[in-house]
Amino acid sequence: MARSKTSHRWLKEHFDDPYVKMAQKDGYRSRASYKLLEIQEKDRILRPGMTVVDLGAAPGGWSQVTSRLIGDRGRLIASDILPMDSIPDVTFIQGDFTDDAVFALLLEAIGEQPVDLVISDMAPNMSGVKAADQPRAMYLCELALDLAGRVLRPGGDFLIKIFQGEGFDQYLRQVREGFDKVQMRKPLSSRDRSREQYLLARGFRGA
């Protein structure tokens, strides 16, 4: 089957993308690494020795950045529905985050040690129909917030990809109830046409 004009356009944009070229040059698995690096440069959310949970981790761009910045004394637990090539000293749980059994496996892997930071770059498979995509995206955000509320230490931080639309304002209010400070970030490496933003919540108040 011949490729559509849309897929031709996507491929051209992808390979012309300066962040894709930078990722190939710098050894990162995806352009998403630069989104986290930009946020890190501004907000310094990652430090040596931290315990971090990375949701929606595949192919591993955020895990690569995180692992490097938390160092040998740090601990990183990552999860995705898709497989991810191993990264040294990273514990990876493959499975559907919306599945209770996978959620339980992730909690088991985290164990009793309080987590300093939960990061999530999760997004559902987009159909292009906003009325269908937005509720699925917000459901993943709700689950990520639930996990963060269970595992974060008091004072811990939460960074999550979120899409403007139905449910956004309610979610923002919910996050503000549990954290001291909430800010929105739109990295330069996030494509202009994308509705994605990153919500950064700092200073978890405790369960």
Curated annotation (Swiss-Prot):
Q: Give the reaction(s) catalysed.
A: uridine(2552) in 23S rRNA + S-adenosyl-L-methionine = 2'-O-methyluridine(2552) in 23S rRNA + S-adenosyl-L-homocysteine + H(+)
Q: Which domain of life is it from?
A: Bacteria
Q: Which UniProt keywords apply?
A: Cytoplasm, Methyltransferase, rRNA processing, S-adenosyl-L-methionine, Transferase
**Residue numbers binding S-adenosyl-L-methionine:** 60, 62, 80, 96, 121
Gene3D superfamilies (UniProt xref): Vaccinia Virus protein VP39
Q: What is its main location?
A: cytoplasm
- Official protein name in the record: Ribosomal RNA large subunit methyltransferase E
Organism in which the protein naturally occurs:
Azotobacter vinelandii (strain DJ / ATCC BAA-1303)
Which gene is this protein's source?
rlmE
